[in-house]
């Protein structure tokens, strides 16, 4: 069965973010969150710099599957420059989307909306939400802590 042009576009965007992730690396002066997905081996270190209530810079490192890496890249693009509240709203929209609850708000995710198809593969939901959950932990830590945990 041939993929439709739209499916090909989604696949190309996901592969692009996975092979050339945006905001890859680590920030020196930032909140550090280490998380892993023990079911598949994905590991992420998210570093977030908050200036007042906004995400002024963000970066991630680690290793993971295509979905995990692409999602982290897409998340960093979506939340940089956003307030903590806006970032949490985007995380909630993303979580709803990858569990099959879609609405027009997912357009706010930018390229992240291309991961909506993950909802068809429940075993991949944790891969797609790892970076977003790390972001939530960074915001909950009020940008001052180093947190390590499993997802």
Predicted segments with their positions:
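Structured beta-strand/loop patches that form or line metal/cofactor-binding pockets in enzymes
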Residues: 20-62
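C-terminal binding/interaction regions
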Residues: 1-28, 82-151
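Short, thiol/selenol-centered motifs that function as redox-active sites or metal-ligating centers
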Residues: 63-69
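Alpha-helical macromolecular-interaction surfaces
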Residues: 69-70, 89
């Amino acid at each position: 069965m041939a993929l439709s042009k739209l499916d090909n576009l989604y696949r190309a965007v996901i592969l692009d973010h996975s092979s050339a992730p945006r905001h890859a690396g680590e920030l020196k002066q930032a909140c550090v969150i280490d998380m892993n997905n023990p079911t598949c081996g994905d590991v992420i270190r998210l570093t977030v710099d908050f200036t007042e209530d906004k995400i002024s810079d963000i970066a991630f490192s680690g290793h993971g599957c295509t979905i995990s890496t692409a999602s982290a890249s897409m998340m960093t693009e979506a939340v940089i420059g956003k307030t903590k509240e806006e970032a949490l709203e985007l995380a909630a929209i993303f979580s709803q989307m990858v569990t099959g609850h879609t609405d027009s708000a997912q357009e706010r995710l930018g390229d992240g909306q291309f991961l909506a198809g993950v909802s068809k593969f429940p075993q991949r939901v944790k891969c797609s939400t790892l970076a977003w959950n790390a972001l939530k932990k960074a915001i909950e830590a009020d940008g001052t802590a180093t947190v390590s945990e499993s997802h």
